Amino acid sequence: LTPNKLDVLSGDQYTAYLSDMISTVKNNTSSSLRSYTFLDKSPSNYYRKVFDNNTDWQKDMYRTAMTQNYKISVEGGDEIGMYDLSLGYTKSESTGKGTDFDRLNLRFNTDIKVFSKVNTELDIAYSQNSYHIMDNGWSESYDMQNIGSTNVLGLIQAPFISPYAYYYDENATDAYSSDRLRLSHEYAGKYAANGGTLMQNPFNFSNMINTGSNIMNEALRNPYWILQNGEGNNKNYAQTTQINLNVKPTYQVTKTFSISDRFNFNMNRGNEKYFLPVSGTTNYYLQDLGYVTSVQKTFFSKATTLQNDLRLNWENTYGAHHVNVFGGWRYNNYSYSYNYMQGYNNENDKLPILSKNMKYINYGGSNDNWIDMTYYFDANYNYKNRYFADFTVSSMAGSRFGDSTKDGFQLCGVSWGVFPSLQLGWVISSEPWFKTSKGINYLKLTAGVDQSGNDDLDYYAARTYWESVKVTHNTVGL
């Protein structure tokens, strides 16, 4: 893949544009014009090298990307068993530097005849997806951090500033250290302040506009510094892993009667890390908290599912009559856990470790587990594949049900729901008197009545519980 860049103003064009905008500002004086240091192109201007550049911010943030796919598959078998083994690997680069993807997947399927009346189906699958992924695109909100997307910064960063420019600030404060990279503390935002009044003004921007009770964050970060300091498996990285095991032994007791048990295990695991480095940073003010520079976030989740379906099946055909009856017990066990953590102002990009020394730490998580089981029975009949009848009934209990439900019944201290169903069908087009046409070659009429339920209940809906919560990032309460 070859990237295409968007056309934006050059440094000279941007300077000319801002000069035109300055001419529209009322009450400009020679003294006020001197505050726009980028207008002065004379060699004696101390800031000339800072603002006399033609920087193409997109130039070194993209690359020609390549995608690779590899697959090996082996299959075979005999009258005893059949098997299929496949292994695949994919690696894909993004046209944006710092972002790529790779996937490893393995799968094994087999059907084995263990004994003369016992056969087993086995399916094992493993998949792992890994991502080096930089912040990309616009965020829905920047209430909690500055813009960290390199492709966005490559479009909106001022083109007359050099990516490597430093200059000494005689008015340095604790908030602005004199040796800090000053690429976007000026001329890189949307608004300015004049006498405490905000005005739209695309040329006089500061790192932070303080208008009394309102503070606006306008300074932009250096995208190249984010690329250089943001890559790594312990920084902007995500990984998902999935494991699936499915086994089904079947015992054919007679020609018409069989017993089977299907067991399934599934696990999904996810791990995400986000890192916005301190190098090349600008101060950012969080409402009611304070100033932040770097941002670090982690998220881990794990979901497992255990399922078992024990089934007895009887099926026979008597002339034009076909009967199938089966019933069994189904068990599901679900668990889901996650935890997250977020902190600010890590002072060393080489050690991206979340610790208690970071500012405004926020964390949380959950660990949920729920179970349900169902007894079910199904009987279906058809005559000449023309007339159909099907009756089904199931009884289900779940850990998310309350102890005193209005419907169903109580057994063994839990609530059970009963869900019957009756369905009838008639294939009209199979009748001797029905004449098919080009417009209709199959016509079936079905009717039925059933009672269904809903197990999509909130995990805590049937419980009374206490929960600790953080207040203003400093206090814990109930």
What does each of the following model-derived ranges do?
Residues 1-97, 136-138, 166-218, 223-236, ...:
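Residues embedded in well-ordered regular secondary structure
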Residues 32-50, 276-285, 290, 471-478:
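Surface-exposed, extracytoplasmic segments of Gram-negative outer-membrane nutrient-acquisition systems
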Residues 59-133, 149, 154, 158-169, ...:
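Transmembrane beta-barrel wall of Gram-negative outer-membrane proteins
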Residues 103, 109-118, 124-128, 198, ...:
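Extracellular/periplasmic, surface-exposed regions of secreted and cell-surface proteins
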Residues 134-141, 278-279, 434-440:
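Short, glycine/acidic-rich hinge or "gate" loops at secondary-structure transitions
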Residues 139-150, 469:
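Acidic, Ser/Thr-rich peripheral helices and adjacent loops at domain boundaries
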Residues 140-142, 280-282, 344-346:
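Juxtamembrane/interface motifs at transmembrane-helix termini
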